[in-house]
Amino acid sequence: VDGNLPFGSAAELGLTGHHALFLGEWLAQPLYLVAPKPNDARAYFSLRDQLSLPQEQFNLLARGVELNHFYQTHQFCGKCGGKTEQKSDEWAVQCQVCGFRTYPVICPCVIVAVRRGSQILLANHMRHKGGMYTTLAGFVEVGETFEEAVHREIWEETQIEVKNLRYVGNQPWAFPNSQMVGFLADYAAGEIHVQPEEIYDAQWFDCEQPLPELPPHGTIARKLIEATLVLCQQDKNKS
């Protein structure tokens, strides 16, 4: 890097001597990741605070956060323990001793909005502070399809069975390295019995009534909830 950044020089931004990693382009300008050093006292924004950005911009930020996490956690070879070095031609590290090459780890996670007639299933998760209710989600296990993960996660967390799965979309989720894969599903059977280690409370909420605090706009969870509300309204208009 020549020391010049799209919106100022490295010296002007106090980044002289920092390693810059090329991430791609934004508005025809090169975009670099510059990770702060341990003694950096400047204030930084949380990635969660940027969820309202346009999807393309948020994804670029997520890429930077995920790559930074990858390089920080793969400084040594997982095969022989040797020191690794970053590859210049791709996002990867290679062991300087045995040559083993490692690529960024991406952990797929299914996230599902379940509908029962004019109701939507929402849960208050243990990991969330406060009263926010959101969709159910969980990591895909080894040797498992996305659809199998949907059925398993919903059953484990609420004892509810679902049917009629429909893929909606996905979202990079750099907290620290997930890929959220979103589905809509219909209720099939069962009564709610929450998994206490994961879920504080889960309820069926009437789509026509005020809902509790929801996940922020920009999240795939919010997109799934809003898609379910649209389906409920469409069915109401038909009746």
Question: Predicted segment positions?
Answer:
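Cys/His-rich short segments
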Residues: 63-115
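N-terminal strand-loop-strand
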Residues: 92-134, 161-162, 185
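Short acidic-hydrophobic surface loop/beta-edge motif
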Residues: 21-26, 93-95, 114, 172-173
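The catalytic Nudix box helix
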Residues: 134-169, 183, 191
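Nudix hydrolase/Nudix homology domain
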Residues: 1-74, 129-133, 195-239
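Short acidic-glycine loop/turn motifs at beta-strand connectors
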Residues: 26-27, 116-118, 189
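Active-site-adjacent beta-strand/loop module that shapes the phosphate/pyrophosphate-binding cleft
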Residues: 171-194
